[in-house]
């Protein structure tokens, strides 16, 4: 299945280039990539559990934690799609208006650019709430993953704001997207780990 998804996403990537950054195709390409990350993350944690059977402690997956993780995963996917849309629109506007400054390019975007920032800080508060839930009752791999999620979201917000106010290299955008994609996979791993620990 993973091999099929990789091939399909590669083919869709070629279509993205030939379509001159069609926003719908770019978003579809990103959705497929995130689905691939989720599948690979699930396969990774399943393999890890088989090899390290004794590494998991008896931890109950509470309803609060379950709902928080599912909500966090959904919000991150939406956040990535919003960011992809913003980046695509900026590049399309820059092609049509090559003399626009960075500020003018940002001003040309719709109001959903603010939604991207608001959602980012919502993710930060939600991840902080998860850290609070894991503070006393959770140990080992699960707690490490929760703190990694919180730290990565903080770094992503910092990097996103730096990209707005400073002329950072183009590779920064790539790392910004990669970091968010890692979060999608880490949440899948964490949720699956807790499900296992509950059983």
Language-model-detected regions and their locations in the chain:
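Polytopic transmembrane helical bundles with strong interfacial aromatic enrichment
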Residues: 1-199
């Amino acid at each position: 299945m993973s091999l099929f998804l990789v091939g399909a996403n590669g083919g869709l990537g070629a279509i993205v280039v030939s379509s001159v950054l069609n926003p719908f195709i770019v978003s579809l390409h990103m959705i497929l990539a995130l689905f691939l990350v989720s599948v690979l993350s699930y396969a990774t944690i399943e393999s890890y559990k088989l090899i390290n059977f004794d590494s998991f402690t008896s931890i109950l997956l509470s309803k609060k934690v379950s709902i928080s993780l599912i909500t966090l995963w959904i919000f991150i996917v939406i956040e990535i799609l919003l960011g992809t849309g913003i980046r695509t629109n900026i590049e399309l506007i820059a092609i049509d208006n090559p003399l626009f400054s960075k500020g003018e390019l940002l001003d040309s975007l719709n109001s959903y650019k603010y939604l991207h920032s608001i959602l980012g800080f919502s993710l930060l508060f939600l991840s902080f709430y998860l850290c609070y839930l894991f503070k006393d009752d959770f140990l080992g791999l699960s707690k490490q993953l929760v703190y990694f999620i919180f730290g990565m979201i903080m770094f992503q917000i910092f990097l996103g704001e730096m990209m707005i106010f400073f002329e950072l290299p183009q590779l920064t955008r790539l790392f910004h997207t990669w970091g968010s994609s890692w979060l999608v996979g880490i949440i899948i791993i964490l949720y699956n780990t807790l499900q296992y620990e509950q059983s």
